[in-house]
């Protein structure tokens, strides 16, 4: 197999990535039937942006393989495969307005309000392992009883990322970026994605 990443955010992707992991899992389960593939991904989401770009790459490859009948498997096995690649890969199988519960269930909602979002990605990232190691108290799960209101503006504005204070205390430059964005007149709210 050959895996190629192109696009402005392709430079920092190593040989071990979600696509290579997925291919290895599919081969180990003999789902590819010794077929070889050239896979080309145009990377449109920055690496380590906390937006699940790598997970969605893998999910798109799975969707393609299933749609083209390259792999044949059960829904149960497909769910297991996505979990082996990454916990949020399953969201990419049908990603619009989807909430992944902490108890492995998925809820989907239709006709949710759309927002204009500005994404700011500094030229550095944080180690997820390091950031989580500094958490002293975990918040209670917020998505175990999801409903459509979770996609409303007021609900989203009240939400927070528990990891954000840890990251902001570590990176002074990021505090300045957040402060600047908060001061903009038409900015409704700012939020860090993922673990920084």
What residues fall within each predicted segment?
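Phosphate-handling active-site elements
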Residues: 30-38, 64-85
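Conserved, helical-rich catalytic subdomain that frames metal- and/or nucleotide-binding sites
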Residues: 92-94, 98-189
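Short pre-catalytic strand/loop immediately N-terminal to key active-site residues, enriched for Gly-Thr
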Residues: 37-49, 190
């Amino acid at each position: 197999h050959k895996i190629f990443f192109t696009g402005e955010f392709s430079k920092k992707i190593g040989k071990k990535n979600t696509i290579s992991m997925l291919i290895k899992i599919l081969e180990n389960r003999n789902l590819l039937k010794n077929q070889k593939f050239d896979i080309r991904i145009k990377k449109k989401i920055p690496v380590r942006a906390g937006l699940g770009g790598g997970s969605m790459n893998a999910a798109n490859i799975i969707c393609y393989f299933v749609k083209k009948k390259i792999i044949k498997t059960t829904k149960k096995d497909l769910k297991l495969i996505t979990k082996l690649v990454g916990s949020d890969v399953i969201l990419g199988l049908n990603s619009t307005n989807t909430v992944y519960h902490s108890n492995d269930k998925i809820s989907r909602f239709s006709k949710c309000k759309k927002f204009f979002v500005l994404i700011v990605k500094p030229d550095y990232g944080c180690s997820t392992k390091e950031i989580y190691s500094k958490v002293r108290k975990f918040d209670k799960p917020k998505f175990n009883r999801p409903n459509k209101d979770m996609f409303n503006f007021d609900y989203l504005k009240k939400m927070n990322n528990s990891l954000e204070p840890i990251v902001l205390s570590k990176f002074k430059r990021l505090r300045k970026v957040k402060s600047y964005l908060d001061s903009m007149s038409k900015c409704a709210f700012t939020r860090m994605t993922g673990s920084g």
